[in-house]
Amino acid sequence: MSTLVFLEHHEGELQKDSLGVLGKAAQLGDDVSALIAGSGVEGLAAQAARFGASKVYLADDPALAAPLPQPRVDVAADLIRRHGFDTVLFGATVLTADVAAGLAARLDAGLNWDLVELTQENGKLVGKRPALDDTVYVDVGWKSEPRLALIRTGTFEPVESGGEAGVEQVDVQLQDFSTLATMVEQAHEESEGPSIEEADVIVAGGRGLGGPENFALIEELAKALGGAVAATRAVVDAGWYPYSAQVGQTGKTVSPRLYVALGISGAIQHKVGMQGSNVIVAINKDPNAPIFEYADLGVVGDLHQIVPKLTELVNAKNAAHFPRG
Amino acid sequence: MDIPPIESGAGMKIAVCAKVVPEQARRIDPETKRLDRSGEQTLNPFDANAVEEALRLKGDDAGAEVVLVSLGPERSLDALRKALAMGADRVVLVADEAAAGSDLVASSYALAQVLEREGADLILFGQQANDSDGAVMWAAVADRLRRPLISQVAELTVSDGTLRGKRQTEFGYDVIEAPLPVAVAVSDAINEPRYPSLKGIMGAKKKPQQTLSLSDLGVDADRAGEAGSRTEVYAIGEPPPRGETQRIDDDGTGAEKIVEFLLERKAL
Ligand SMILES: Cc1cc2nc3c(=O)[nH]c(=O)nc-3n(C[C@H](O)[C@H](O)[C@H](O)COP(=O)(O)OP(=O)(O)OC[C@H]3O[C@@H](n4cnc5c(N)ncnc54)[C@H](O)[C@@H]3O)c2cc1C
Ligand SMILES: Cc1cc2nc3c(=O)[nH]c(=O)nc-3n(C[C@H](O)[C@H](O)[C@H](O)COP(=O)(O)OP(=O)(O)OC[C@H]3O[C@@H](n4cnc5c(N)ncnc54)[C@H](O)[C@@H]3O)c2cc1C
């Protein structure tokens, strides 16, 4: 196997999921190369080597400064064509999904997404893939090379093996259309206040709340339970709640003792951020909502009816435990 | 970083890629190893957001056009009429037995062929197909059409031939700009899709609905369906066992039941 792992980075750090995939690739075969594309990224090569790359290709060019996918497709396609990698792996993010799918079209190469395991079976690479809201696990493969794969968020932990790698600069030649999209502004999160990642109890709200004003319901329940408030991307994108409280693929990963999901459908991209919770309770009015597949207790009902009462009951319990006077 | 309000997309031609998916009871057929598409079908709910955004951009500009483009079985037309009823102007469906079982490589190729013919200024995609959860199609199509791409867009404006989109990544929000013609995938938070009016539903039947075969598009059979696909499914298995899940219907005592459960699990 000759594998290329695409490494994403942010503010001078390689992404944890990228490094996790690199470690997995190194475990599957010893010829593992990494591609780092960006501007001023030379310093990242040593880190890639420590986490399993035996060769690092650097595409270092001001045109690659913004994390946009299309120029990265150009660079990766050239590199793959030149070196004939048979396997190209990505830790799934907003950026890498677009790079991988662009490459699939450019190279006429099969892309399997959302993989949670990769194994060699009789010399054949097989991906394990949960589908249909994780109700089935499918073994998938590729009919030709290169084989492209996106690995689900949070799947493989990085393994520091402490190796060294040869580093090679690659030529950056971009297609006309690849540079038409430009980054105008990037607003990164400033973290303030306690992070939901440390919370012991989380009460999370989704679009089922019906409007931003109803986050008050969530806040009261969270207060009663001594927990923090979280939200789905749908409500964060809609401006109902701040991004710093978002749980999921593009938000925080949390594993509290108790996670209460209110008016949340339970999409995979949300699940990957909270499936490590010890106990999950969900209220949703749709009996077919995917969240019920993995909630320890699922209540089919209207959150507006149930939550105020729940808050009252919890408050009453608290008062009984800590009687006044 | 508020984005100024939409300016009309004067005379813009907008293509919306819309997938028709099973309504309920989703399963993979153990025989064909494909998704069972025999039951009721519906418009992919995430694509209703793309249709809504197209209609918003079109506004009351009679010179603008919203065309739905879909790849799927012939009977998809029934479900696509919902988008016509919302206000889209016409539909082009690529329906061909030979396209069944297409993966991303094959389906993006066929879609790109229709879109090339349509030559839209803006190609809109939904956030993801809710049967496959790929959230990737746009990037393959944009590459084939050699057009700029903006994905996961939660807010967009068009002015002076430039589209500007705001979108979330793992690190916060980006604002990205690209000139038309451009491919854009929208997030499910971008808008609240309208319900079709009775008049819309009545009118939908009369709107142009074109069905094309692969040969109409000049797509060779070996680039479609399983022949044109580069991925395959070997086996379908059970998910790993997980702890017991309980589901109850709220009969007015939901809150009490939750408290009981939390006490039982020592989570209170
Ligand atoms: C690349 C990518 C990254 C993503 N990252 C994230 C992420 O980090 N985090 C995330 O959350 N999502 C993420 N998403 C989006 C995700 O796919 C879903 O679209 C999103 O999680 C849906 O949010 P929701 O559950 O609030 O809304 P919906 O899916 O609209 O669900 C609302 C739910 O509320 C229920 N409901 C309505 N009214 C009531 C009521 N009165 N009482 C009880 N229940 C009610 C409905 O039945 C429904 O199930 C991502 C998507 C993509 C493509
Ligand atoms: C459970 C399951 C898992 C699958 N896994 C893979 C896989 O790993 N690799 C692979 O190559 N194929 C896979 N497929 C097949 C793949 O779904 C189809 O090839 C499909 O046509 C491509 O859709 P997508 O999943 O990429 O859609 P997405 O990328 O999720 O769709 C995004 C948007 O693209 C547009 N769109 C998608 N499909 C169509 C269409 N047919 N017509 C019009 N517009 C459309 C819609 O606007 C949609 O909102 C899978 C299918 C299923 C049912």
Each predicted region: which residue ranges?
Chain B
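N-terminal glycine-rich FAD/FM-binding segment characteristic of electron-transfer flavoproteins
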Residues: 2-268
